[in-house]
């Protein structure tokens, strides 16, 4: 059984998440209004704020798990990734589903890794993580055509994220025979 840390936010963290979620919601609403000329409303105001609260809470829990400071100045302002850990761009995906899935749109901007967090019963549970290269594979489009979907069981343990980010250079998760320069590596091993 792999370790999946759980967090319950205290009062100060909850207030922080609510205010940050409200600020993000207002920013997104104003930006969309400026870009399109209309306010987008897929859900009620309360539902949209809850989605933002769960997202901010998930990011905060991942920061706590990785021993990162609880500040947001390393967050990408355009929404491409949620935090930077040892030079790696990480996007936190939070869900409230009883059975969590990592769902990434095919049009998502590039990051180095995705972390899945589930909010259920007042607790945030970090389900696992996976590299972008492993997420964006054709066999992961079996559920929806517009997104990549991965079950929680195929995600890596969050403790491995520390090792991956700390030791491996970008692209280290690529198998040697998938690299563009694989023929050079083989030649160098054969002929010394």
Residue locations for each model-derived region?
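Nucleic-acid endonuclease domains
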Residues: 1-86, 93-192
């Amino acid at each position: 059984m792999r370790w999946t840390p759980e967090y319950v936010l205290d009062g100060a963290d909850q207030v922080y998440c609510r205010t940050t979620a409200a600020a993000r919601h207002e920013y997104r609403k104003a930006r969309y209004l400026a870009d399109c000329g209309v306010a987008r409303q897929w859900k009620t105001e309360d539902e949209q704020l809850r989605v933002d609260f769960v997202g901010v809470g998930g990011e905060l829990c991942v920061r706590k798990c990785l021993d990162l400071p609880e500040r947001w100045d390393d967050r990408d302002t355009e929404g491409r990734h949620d935090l930077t850990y040892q030079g790696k761009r990480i996007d936190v995906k939070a869900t409230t589903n009883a059975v969590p899935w990592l769902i990434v749109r095919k049009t998502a901007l590039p990051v180095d890794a995705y972390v899945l967090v589930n909010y259920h019963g007042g607790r945030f549970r970090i389900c696992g993580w996976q590299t972008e290269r492993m997420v964006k594979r054709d066999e992961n489009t079996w559920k929806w055509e517009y997104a990549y979907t991965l079950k929680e069981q195929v995600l890596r343990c969050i403790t491995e994220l520390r090792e991956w980010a700390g030791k491996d250079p970008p692209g280290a998760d690529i198998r040697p025979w998938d690299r563009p320069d694989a023929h050079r590596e083989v030649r160098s091993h054969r002929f010394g």
